[in-house]
Amino acid sequence: MVEERKPHINVGTIGHVDHGKTTLTAALTTVLAKRLSGEGNKSVKYDEIDKAPEEKARGITISTAHVEYETENRHYAHVDCPGHADYIKNMITGAAQMDAAILVVSATDGAMPQTREHILLAKQVGVKDIVVWMNKCDVVDDEEMLSLVEMEIRELLSKYGYPGDDIDVVRGSAVKALEEETGSGVWSEKIMELMNALEKISLPTREKDKPFLMSIEDVFSIPGRGTVVTGRIERGVIRVGDKIEIVGLRDIQSTVCTGVEMFHKALDAGEAGDNAGILLRGIKKEDVERGQVLSAPGQIHSYKKFKAEVYILKKEEGGRHTPFFSNYQPQFYVRTTDVTGSIKLPEGVEMVMPGDNISIEVSLDKPVAIDKGLRFAIREGGRTVGSGIITEILE
């Protein structure tokens, strides 16, 4: 009997420094632990979240706190980053994916520069849904002031392509909710209201339900059987007998999967998340190479030019010591391979300093299989100097 698991959704708190993201994270876990049973519901204190351990993602060190909570219908994994730079790095590297974000805005300040920056980044990196928590409403007794702040947030969300008029805005106070020790009371109810808003968000399509895609890491020739490519299946399912394409670096080749292997066992199929070997019909070892992808027919194409949002590492993070200018030519590590390319900076931007995040245009030397939302590393001589996400395919 397989235990039915609750559908899972990844959320995170975003917003300006000191608007209460971490306090809200603590309040969410605390109120839910008191209100709802469920082994995922444990109260997490502010200090535990604030002293988040550092972790490495794509060669970049990021402090991120991970907490979890659940309702009757869903299980939530929630990320909160202590520092503003950590947010930018987290969103660009995808260290902690977010299906949805809780935008925290202080009722006393309204929208601030980082509020805007986080909304824009959320849009760029493909966060589909946002709900708003207007915090510190206990210290604003002017109803008109609250309405103005709410209106301003809605307009800002619309400006960046979110449905500002329809998004749920919950007015509350994370501090007051934490003070209500029983988990019931007017401010705790606001936390439950926020949870109800999260419950309405549509669940993300699981990777397994998308068309098949696998990045090729290695190629072997097995005498008497043919050519096997290995790699991690990124999305979808592959079955023996499926038609597939080999895309990137060269012209597209069509073939058929004649075998799927994992841990030296032959299987009927492989699915998203599996590290598998795929046997290819009629393909010679020299016809395929690391850096190409296997894909369901017609699902992915190779391109050389794209726009991206990137974060450039600081010197202390092991990045460059000096700025770079337009036409800088590093390697772009895309899926499983390094490809040289050149960077064009936006008009009016002379140079990029270590520690900056910026929108750029990239022209690669060779076409590779890419799609919008794909993350990559920028490398120089094998070390990571930056990280990025593709926001638009050009050609």
Curated annotation (Swiss-Prot):
Protein name as it appears in the record: Elongation factor Tu
Region span, G5: 173-175
EC number: 3.6.5.3
Protein's organism: Ehrlichia chaffeensis (strain ATCC CRL-10679 / Arkansas)
Pfam families on file: GTP_EFTU, GTP_EFTU_D2, GTP_EFTU_D3
Region annotation G2: where it falls in the sequence: 59-63
Family under the similarity heading: Belongs to the TRAFAC class translation factor GTPase superfamily. Classic translation factor GTPase family. EF-Tu/EF-1A subfamily.
GO cellular component, one term: cytosol
Enzyme class of the recorded protein, top EC level: hydrolase
Binding site for GTP: 15-22, 80-84, 135-138
